[in-house]
Design a protein with these regions (language model features):
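Single conserved hydrophobic/aromatic residue that forms the stacking wall/gate
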Residues: 1-12
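Solvent-exposed polar/charged
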Residues: 3-4, 18, 44, 68, ...
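Residues at the starts of beta-strands that form the adenosine-phosphate
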Residues: 9, 22-24, 47, 100, ...
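General small-molecule cofactor/ligand-binding pocket signal
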Residues: 11, 49-51, 178
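Short, acidic, metal-binding catalytic loop of nucleotide-sugar glycosyltransferases
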Residues: 15-21
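Short beta-strand/loop segment that forms part of the nucleotide-sugar
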Residues: 22-30, 51
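Conserved beta-loop-beta/alpha segment of the NTase-like Rossmann-fold superfamily
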Residues: 36, 40-121
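Catalytic-core segments of class I nucleotidyltransferases/pyrophosphorylases
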Residues: 74-75, 82, 88-95, 108-111, ...
Length: 205
């Protein structure tokens, strides 16, 4: 787990807590003893439960460990993603749109640092673009999920959560997107982004 500290604060959990989330469940595998010990000794105003993943099952497979425990729509997040958003608004958006899963996606603008060549027939050049600029939505790794998804997870299946979503989408289920700005998403899994995030949060304190 890579829950980020700024000073002595647990960033991800604090953001959810600020919007009224007080019950957290962590699916733990690597160094789970250390993680449990830390939270058991921590003075906190929220509850943390643990689900032990004995064999790594991907970002989605571990949800099968929560069967029978989830009774309402819930936030499901990777442990290296921090969003500067109104989680209450996202939750209401999910419910009002009747989604089975709502994926929170960030707008992204990217300039390709090279000239791009499109290949035509017989090795010819079909088109050339010098350092094209792209605009797209990217998955932040944060979702709002209906409890039904947990109950329908296959026991012991190794699967990423985006693949779980794709399975439902192909079956005709309603899956939606909540778009956020690029600046609202901080990916702590990238060292450069982690440093940017630290500076941003420290400036907010």
């Amino acid at each position: 787990i890579s829950e980020c500290l700024v000073g002595s604060e647990m960033c991800i959990r604090d953001r959810f807590r600020d919007f009224g989330c007080h019950n957290f469940t962590m699916i733990v595998n690597y160094k789970k003893g250390m993680i449990k010990s830390y939270f058991n000794e921590l003075e906190k105003d929220y509850n943390v439960d643990f689900a032990d993943e004995e064999v790594f099952m991907g970002t989605g497979g571990g949800l099968c460990l929560l069967k029978g425990k989830i009774k309402a729509p819930f936030f499901f997040t990777n442990c290296d993603t921090l969003l500067d958003v109104d989680f209450g608004d996202i939750y209401e958006y999910h419910k009002s749109h009747g989604n089975l899963v709502t994926m929170i996606c960030a707008f992204k603008h990217y300039t390709v640092p090279y000239g791009v060549v499109e290949l035509g027939e017989n090795g010819s050049i079909a088109a050339m673009r010098e350092k094209p600029e792209l605009d797209f939505l990217t998955n932040t790794g944060v979702y709002v999920v209906e409890p039904r998804v947990v109950e329908e997870m296959r026991d012991g299946e190794k699967i990423g959560f985006p693949d779980v979503i794709e399975r439902y989408r192909r079956a005709g289920e309603k899956v939606g997107v909540y778009p956020i700005s690029e600046s609202s998403w901080m990916d702590m899994g990238q060292l450069e982004e982690l440093e940017k995030m630290r500076r941003k949060l420290e400036n907010q304190q």
